[in-house]
Regions:
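N-terminal nucleic-acid-engaging modules of covalent nucleotidyltransferase systems
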Residues: 1-182
Length: 182
């Protein structure tokens, strides 16, 4: 069956979902090459390179604004997961069908250049509170599914949702050098 073409400048979640659905490694590699972008490479490096050490606390991302507290409680991770669940239930996660309201104000394609702030050796002088605040601000601006990806990557758990291996990534992008980053 033919592979769906994604729109120009697709969201990261659209690329990863499409690649993850492929049964063969060859198809996965082909699509990773087709939708190659520095932002996707950076996320894969953070996720799969053991020498990249996250400076963010592992697990749930704690956050609630005053407005949010009146509506619900819980962490930002919980809120992202609730939005993702609602979108999946309403089938609004299919390629390009997410409503504009839920799309967010920015994308990982735009924000990836800030990721160095969250890893060891990137911006070590940044105070923990400032780093965590910056991370939360980025998450709040992203489409919920891209925010979920960023939360998975910070804990090196991308494979839990997207069945794309380090080997798939290494084959698609042989110029990535693994190790020696921290």
């Amino acid at each position: 069956q033919p592979i769906v073409d994604l729109p120009p400048n697709p969201f990261t979640f659209e690329v990863l979902a499409l690649v993850s659905k492929q049964r063969s490694n060859a198809k996965k590699v082909e699509l990773l090459k087709k939708y190659d972008h520095d932002s996707i490479r950076a996320l894969f490096i953070w996720n799969y390179d053991d020498s990249v050490i996250s400076l963010l606390p592992p697990g749930e991302v704690p956050y609630s604004s005053l407005k949010d507290e009146q509506i619900s409680s819980g962490s930002l991770s919980t809120k992202v997961n609730q939005l993702v669940g609602t979108m999946e239930y309403n089938d609004t996660v299919s390629m390009g069908n997410a409503t504009d309201m839920k799309r967010g104000r920015t994308t990982l394609r735009r924000e990836w250049t800030k990721l160095y702030n969250f890893i060891k050796g990137g911006n070590d002088s940044l105070k923990s509170l400032a780093r965590e605040t910056m991370f939360i601000q980025i998450l709040e601006g992203l489409h919920p599914l891209d925010a979920e990806i960023l939360c998975l990557v910070k804990d090196k758990k991308l494979y839990d949702k997207y069945k794309i291996t380090k080997e798939n990534v290494a084959e698609a992008y042989p110029d990535i050098r693994w190790g020696g980053r921290s």
